[in-house]
Amino acid sequence: MSDGLVPGEVIPGEGTVTLNEGRERTEVTVGNTGDRPSQVGSHFHFFEANAALEFDREAAMGMRLNIPAGTAVRFEPGDEQTVELVEIGGKRRAHGMNGLVNGSVDGETGDAVERMRAAGFGDTGEAAPDDGDTESDQ
């Protein structure tokens, strides 16, 4: 090319790029209870990650890994690691994945939590709230 440009060349701008500035963050400790590695991509709704991954799923509602786009974190069987999550941006909707949310990640999340528990997803979070109808209450 006569103008000095190279096809596909990336010419970075000056300065520093700050990722996810101003977004809520949290950390969760994740253990892989499965017998195979599990890899979670940068923009996957972490609440719905592989059922063999055990962590506080309610803390991960509306969150994704705080890593650069197009990258992933791999969880080996039997290993445990702490990861940083960041809130999902845009319209804050999650569709597909494991079918636990299929809509907004804001507001009432009780149905998604019930589906997660019924499907046997690993969860270290709080137990389901007591409905007050136990034998000891009677």
Swiss-Prot record:
Gene Ontology molecular function: urease activity
Acidic residues bias spans: 128-138
Locations listed in the record: Cytoplasm
Keywords: Cytoplasm, Hydrolase, Plasmid
GO biological process: urea catabolic process
Chemical reaction(s) catalysed: urea + 2 H2O + H(+) = hydrogencarbonate + 2 NH4(+)
Quaternary structure (record): Heterotrimer of UreA (gamma), UreB (beta) and UreC (alpha) subunits. Three heterotrimers associate to form the active enzyme.
Family: Belongs to the urease beta subunit family.
Entries under HAMAP family matching the protein: Urease_beta
Protein name per Swiss-Prot or TrEMBL: Urease subunit beta
Organism: Haloarcula marismortui (strain ATCC 43049 / DSM 3752 / JCM 8966 / VKM B-1809) (Halobacterium marismortui)
Name of the gene encoding the protein in the UniProt record: ureB
